[in-house]
């Protein structure tokens, strides 16, 4: 790690748009599902590397609200991959805590299969180490949907008389984000060559740097 820049120049939070798996598989004559299997392996490697270099948080865009439009067999394969990963994460959560990082599943979890909802809840421990790294796994996530979620929370406070509409601030909206309490992403990476955010961390990425590359 000696080639890393000084800590003050290191990002605190990196977001990664996990796409390009299907094309990777196609170019190698493999089924799209195999691309997702390999992507899951890379996810674990990157997560460990982020921990080793001292990041505060990483957010992985694993499954968007728009991904339900994909072929049913591909969705089924993805749900199986998520099930296997979260099962493993649940079994190793205390070991992971000792290593110094915590898993969070963010997004509209209620839209996932019930088995995944239960695993997502069980695999995520309450954070007892403020110096640990947080890994956000974004499932059934959409940036616009997240903003709507935050606004709904604010509207509920206004309805109850807990907040005056004139006092609503950016901080109130940020507090309703799934990533509340974490620094906004300094850097967002998309490795597929696509030059767009695709509804990822829409609110939080206002001042992010972007790295788009084609490494498939």
Residue ranges and their predicted role:
Residues 1-216:
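Flexible, compositionally biased loop and terminal segments
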């Amino acid at each position: 790690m000696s080639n890393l820049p000084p800590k003050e120049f290191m990002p605190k939070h990196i977001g990664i748009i996990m796409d390009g798996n299907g094309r990777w598989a196609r170019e190698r004559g493999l089924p799209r599902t195999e691309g997702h299997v390999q992507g899951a392996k890379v996810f674990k490697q990157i997560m460990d590397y982020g921990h080793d270099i001292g990041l505060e948080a990483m957010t992985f865009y694993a499954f968007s609200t728009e991904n339900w439009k994909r072929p049913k067999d591909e969705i089924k394969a993805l749900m199986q991959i998520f099930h296997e990963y979260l099962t493993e994460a649940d079994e190793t959560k205390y070991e992971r805590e000792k290593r110094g990082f915590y898993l969070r599943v963010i997004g509209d979890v209620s839209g996932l299969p019930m088995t995944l909802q239960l695993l997502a809840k069980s695999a995520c421990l309450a954070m007892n180490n403020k110096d640990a790294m947080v890994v956000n796994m974004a499932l059934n996530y959409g940036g616009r949907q997240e903003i709507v979620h935050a606004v709904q929370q604010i509207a509920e406070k206004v309805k109850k008389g807990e907040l005056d509409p004139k006092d609503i601030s950016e901080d109130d909206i940020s507090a309703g984000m799934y990533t509340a309490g974490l620094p906004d992403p300094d850097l967002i990476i998309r490795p597929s060559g696509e030059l767009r955010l695709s509804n990822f961390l829409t609110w939080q990425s206002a001042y992010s740097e972007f790295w788009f590359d084609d490494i498939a």
